[in-house]
């Protein structure tokens, strides 16, 4: 392999050879751009946009556009792009990853592709890892774009929807990866088009791309909330269910009954179909529910929750049996596996049935935190038409970038050669000895005024070393807080003569450590790592803090045989060898076997973590395909499309499904079970029951379907005429569809999550869990679509004109799964506090505790 590389060069070297002529072309415009006035330079933006409209491509414009940005940066910030930065800009425009060492000016590089791609007018997102960097870069680099006539926006955690919308509508938007992902999910939960904040996902430039697409890719983005306003509804429905009378099972409705004109009478408040595990309310039952909850029409869209919960309570009492389907143990309802008879702890029935059983058994009804929306970073960033990234360390993960994101990594040479000395790892027997050696090393460097940066993995270790340095009387700064503004200042000062800084490994990324002259004289920044990280890439990031732009510096890692890395992944035999050798205390161990053992352990961990991320992506891909379908359907509704044809298709599909469920095509007419068909169909579509005359008028079940479809469509058209304005009914269709889709999709996310957690057991049965998950997920998605159709059709047939037609969110967002503490400040009360005995602010004249305070 090395002979091949010597002969043909690395992948990066071969690619760079193709790019050099383009860089020369950019440089050739230098004098021409320098001769333009500010006004003429600004007008170039307009000229490029016009040329794009006339058919030129971005690649055609690249040399001139990059030269324009270069000149603008020189005039506005006094910074001119080096050749290597122009190379980086070209690679980013091509949708690749540029690996540029720390201090090579990645922030300035991003201005080139951002400007060029913003000319299309579709928006460019520059993605950073925290709010501080997004704000800093938008204010700093944004000056270049604004000078050239482009609008620059920034999205911060504290912003309102209106501010976010404005920022996303700018030509270039600076935003963190979390905000970008959560805004995408929130946009797919809105109920009016005007509430959307993002526009299309066109082009993303990801700063610290390895951190965003690899380190954070193991945790999906999750927006959670509580569906169902309160658990009290389950308890109320349980009380009602106990008061309702079960109707007698209706005997099969034969053809002879129909000929004799015998009408079937419904008895009781509800009927139970044990065969299909279905409970349906009779007319009497509907009246009882309406009286109990003091509502006018149970079928109205806003009463969907009540209707759903009443049916659940009836199912809990009539179809779910204690010690058969479930057991109650330690004040908890536990499901019994119907095939094995084993208790399944941790599993819960979905769609609220578990809560209904809890209410029935008088145990604490658990208020479920529901996942309202979720997506992984892998699938989210793959939605962009084009994406690129830059980082100081990506080559070690090149395979992952290529396999999962379709992006290759190009290593860009440094502007000046790196002269940092990377020493071999210093290995000690115990952690105590290692920390002692670190402190001695810091003391020696500090004595000659050399700045030192000590990188730790955990806050505990940074505090241990800090305490040891205090005892030695060495002044130092500890950086492990979450406040990014403070972090940048501390990191920037770490290059001063005699400075000692202790930082957790990831801290201070994005900020340069600049050396003063005395520090350079003393040997430059000395970087000490107190432990190897799980990924060589993060070790390299720490090393990369030193030796920027040709500065002197050195780096070394201190390791002990007690470190997690060596304990968990190092070979036990090796550890035994060193233990039996009896190494004297505080003495460094040096051995070739040890160095290779460390490298092998790191490779093992990296492979392990890559496997976890790949596995997560494969499972999420199943959800992703389903998510695309649901979100596309929602977007159609939001865009105000006429959904009439969609509803008609739902109606005909439901008729087909009901007929096929009850009457197979091979069955002779004499054996058709009209009773079951009527019960199933009229619960959804309030048609006149099918009778003997109808059966006589058709030859087979195909003709019966046709007859029932015609009747259902006519009935729907009659419902439309009840509304004075056709558009009023069209909006009602959209309201109902949104409400039902959202509710069912949220339940489906939960169900898929439960399936995902239990699917691993399939491996014991010699089955591939992923294949089983795909098949089961597909079936569940089909069921969800059928349920959406059924609920939508039922609601639209039963809706009454007097109700208000308003969209409302199905569930209230209560939080996300990412840390926002760094940006959230305590909220201050704006209104005066009202005490229980104060007069009520509503003006009733009563005390607050006897009036509005009761509800609070």
For each predicted feature, which ranges?
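Short, Lys/Glu-rich amphipathic helical modules
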Residues: 448-462, 639-641, 693-699, 841
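Conserved P-loop NTPase motor core
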Residues: 1-582, 631-632, 648-649, 653, ...
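Active-site-adjacent structural elements in folded domains
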Residues: 110, 438, 825-827, 835
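Short Cys/His-rich zinc-binding micro-motifs
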Residues: 830-849, 853
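Extended, charged helical/alpha-beta scaffold domains that provide interaction surfaces
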Residues: 326-334, 340-348, 549-550, 557, ...
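Hydrophobic, well-ordered secondary-structure elements that form the walls
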Residues: 454, 502, 745, 781, ...
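Positions in alpha-helical segments
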Residues: 27-31, 617, 779, 838
């Amino acid at each position: 392999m090395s002979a091949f590389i010597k002969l043909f060069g690395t992948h990066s070297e071969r690619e760079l050879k193709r790019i050099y002529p383009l860089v020369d072309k950019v440089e050739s415009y230098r004098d021409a751009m320098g001769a333009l006035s500010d006004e003429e330079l600004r007008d170039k933006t307009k000229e490029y946009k016009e040329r794009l409209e006339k058919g030129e491509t971005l690649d055609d414009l690249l040399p001139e556009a990059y030269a324009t940005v270069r000149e603008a940066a020189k005039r506005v910030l006094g910074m001119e792009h080096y050749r290597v930065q122009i190379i980086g800009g070209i690679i980013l425009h091509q949708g690749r990853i540029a690996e540029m060492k720390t201090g090579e000016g990645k922030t300035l590089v991003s201005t080139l592709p951002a400007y060029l791609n913003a000319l299309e007018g579709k928006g460019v997102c520059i993605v950073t890892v925290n709010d501080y960097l997004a704000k800093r870069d938008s204010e700093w680099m944004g000056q270049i774009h604004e000078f050239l006539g482009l609008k620059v926006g920034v999205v911060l955690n504290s912003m309102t929807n209106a501010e976010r919308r404005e920022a996303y509508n700018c030509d270039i938007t600076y935003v963190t990866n979390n905000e970008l992902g959560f805004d995408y999910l929130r946009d797919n939960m809105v109920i009016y088009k005007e509430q959307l904040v993002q526009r299309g996902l066109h082009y993303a430039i990801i700063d610290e791309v390895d951190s965003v697409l690899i380190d954070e890719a193991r945790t999906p983005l999750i927006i959670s909330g509580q569906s169902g306003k309160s658990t009290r509804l389950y308890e109320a429905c349980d009380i009602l269910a106990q008061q309702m009378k079960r109707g007698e099972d209706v005997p099969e409705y034969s053809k002879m009954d129909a000929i004799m004109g015998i009408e079937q009478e419904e008895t009781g408040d509800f009927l139970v179909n044990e065969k299909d595990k279905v409970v349906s309310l009779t007319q009497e039952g509907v009246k009882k529910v309406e009286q109990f909850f003091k509502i006018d029409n149970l079928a109205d869209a806003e009463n969907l929750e009540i209707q759903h919960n009443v049916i659940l309570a009836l199912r809990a009492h009539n179809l779910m049996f204690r010690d058969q389907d479930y057991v109650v143990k330690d004040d908890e309802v536990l499901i019994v596996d119907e095939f094995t008879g084993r208790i399944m702890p941790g599993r819960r029935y979905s769609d609220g049935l578990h809560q209904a059983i809890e209410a029935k058994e008088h145990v604490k009804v658990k208020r479920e935190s529901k996942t309202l929306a979720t997506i992984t970073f892998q699938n989210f960033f793959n939605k962009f038409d084009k994406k690129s990234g830059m980082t100081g360390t990506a080559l070690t993960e090149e395979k992952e970038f290529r396999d999962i994101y379709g992006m290759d990594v190009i290593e860009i040479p440094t502007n000046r050669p790196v002269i940092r000395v990377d020493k071999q790892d210093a290995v000690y027997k115990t952690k105590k000895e290692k920390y002692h050696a670190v402190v001695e090393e810091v003391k020696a460097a500090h004595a000659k005024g050399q700045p030192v940066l000590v990188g730790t993995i955990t806050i505990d270790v940074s505090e241990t070393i800090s305490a040891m340095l205090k005892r030695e009387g060495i002044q130092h700064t500890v950086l492990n807080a979450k406040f990014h503004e403070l972090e940048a200042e501390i990191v920037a000062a770490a290059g001063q003569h005699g400075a000692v800084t202790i930082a957790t490994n990831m801290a201070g990324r994005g900020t340069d450590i600049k050396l003063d002259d005395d520090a350079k004289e003393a040997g430059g920044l000395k970087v000490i790592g107190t432990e190897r990280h799980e990924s060589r890439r993060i070790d390299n990031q720490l090393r990369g803090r030193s030796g920027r732009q040709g500065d002197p510096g050195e780096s070394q890692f201190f390791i002990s045989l007690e470190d997690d890395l060596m304990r968990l992944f190092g070979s036990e035999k090796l550890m035994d060898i060193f233990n039996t050798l009896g190494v004297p205390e505080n003495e460094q161990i040096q051995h070739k076997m040890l160095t290779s053992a460390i490298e092998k352990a790191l490779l093992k961990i990296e492979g392990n973590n890559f496997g976890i991320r790949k596995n997560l992506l494969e499972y999420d891909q199943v959800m992703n395909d389903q998510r695309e379908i649901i979100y596309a359907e929602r977007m159609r509704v939001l865009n105000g499309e006429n959904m009439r044809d969609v509803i008609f298709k739902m109606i005909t599909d439901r008729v087909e499904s009901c007929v096929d469920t009850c009457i197979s095509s091979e069955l002779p007419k004499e054996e058709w079970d009209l009773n079951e068909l009527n019960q199933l169909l009229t619960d959804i579509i309030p048609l006149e029951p099918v009778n003997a005359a109808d059966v006589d008028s058709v030859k087979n079940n195909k003709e019966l379907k046709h007859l029932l479809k015609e009747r259902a469509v006519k009935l729907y058209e009659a419902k439309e005429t009840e509304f004075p304005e056709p558009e009023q009914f069209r909006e009602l269709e959209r309201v109902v569809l949104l409400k039902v889709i959202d509710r069912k999709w949220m339940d489906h996310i939960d169900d898929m999550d439960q399936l995902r957690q239990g699917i691993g057991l399939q491996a014991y049965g010699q089955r591939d869990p992923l294949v089983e998950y795909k098949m089961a997920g597909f079936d569940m998605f089909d069921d969800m679509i059928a349920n959406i159709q059924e609920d939508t059709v039922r609601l639209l047939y039963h809706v009454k004109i007097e109700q208000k037609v308003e969209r409302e969110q199905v569930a209230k967002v209560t939080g996300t799964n990412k840390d926002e503490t760094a940006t959230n400040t305590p909220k201050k009360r704006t209104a005066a506090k009202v005490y229980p005995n104060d007069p009520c602010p509503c003006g009733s004249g009563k005390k607050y505790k006897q009036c509005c305070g009761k509800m609070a």
